[in-house]
Amino acid sequence: MQKSWWSKQYGIIIAIIALLMITAFLYKDSLLDTEKVHEDERLYNVGVLIDSTIYDAGWNQAHYEGFEEAAKELGVKIHYRTFVPDNDNEAIRIAGEELIAEGCREIFATSFGYGEGIIKLAQQHPEIYFFHCAGTETAPNVSVYFGRMYQARYLSGMAAGMRTKTNHIGFVAAMPIVEVIRGINAFTLGVQKVNPQAVVHVRWTDSWDTPEKEKEVTQKLLEDVPVDIVAYHQNSSQLLEVAQAMGAEGIGYHYDNREKFPDTMLTAAVWDWKQFYTKLI
C-alpha cells in the first residue's frame, strides 16, 4: 500500500525537481564592503577561472551560462580563462595576473582545487576581491560559496527509489570531500525514504573530469551489479552517455540535458547560477 502511494507521487517529485533550480546559496562573506566596491567603475570587468571547457554540458557550462546571463542583465564584461588546472598554483597565478591586468577587480574561481592558489594570489593582491566556489578557506579579500544542492539530491533520490525495478542504484562520484559526500548522503536518504529495500552502490573516479575513467568505472559498476539507475557527481555528462548505451537510466547533475537524453535521463539536479551571480556581481 505504501509503495503504491509513493508511486502516485512520482510525477509530483519529478515536477518539483524541474522547478527547483538552486537559488538558495550558501555564501560566506569575508567582511567585503560590497557597497564601497560597487562605487568603483573597474568592477565592471569580472574575471572567471575555469578548469576545463565551458561546453561540457555540466558544471562548467552551468557556470558559464550563469555568468553570461548575469553580464547581460548587469552590463558587465566577463573575462574568462579556461583550462586552468585547479592543482597548479603557478597556472592559477599566471591566469589571475592576466585577469587583473585586464582590469578585473572581482575574480571567481569555479573549481574546488583552486583554493590554495587563490589564497596565495589574494595575499599578493589585497585590492582584488576573490570568490571561490566550493572553497573552504577565506581571507580578508576571499569569500567562498556553494549551493544547497543536497535538497535537489534528496528529491532526485526519491525519484530513483520510486523508479528502480532492481532495487540497485549506482552513484559515480569524483572524490570524498564534503560537498560530494553530502550529496551522496542526501540522495541515499531520498532513496530510502520511498524504498527502504533499495541499495545505493557508490564508486569513485578520484577526478572531476576524466571521461575515460568515468566510462570505465560506470561500465564496471553496471556489469558487476544489477543497477538500473545511475546518478553521479562529476563535471560533465559523460556518465549519462554510458548509462544510455548500457540500457540504464541516468540522473543528471549540473545541467539540463533532457534534449540530449530524452528517453533515459530520469531527472536532474540543476544549477541556476544566474540568480546568484546577478546578485553578487
Regions found by a protein language model. Name each.
Residues 18-23:
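Hydrophobic core of alpha-helical transmembrane segments in multi-pass integral membrane proteins
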Residues 3-13, 24-281:
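A residue-level marker of the well-folded mature domains of exported/periplasmic proteins
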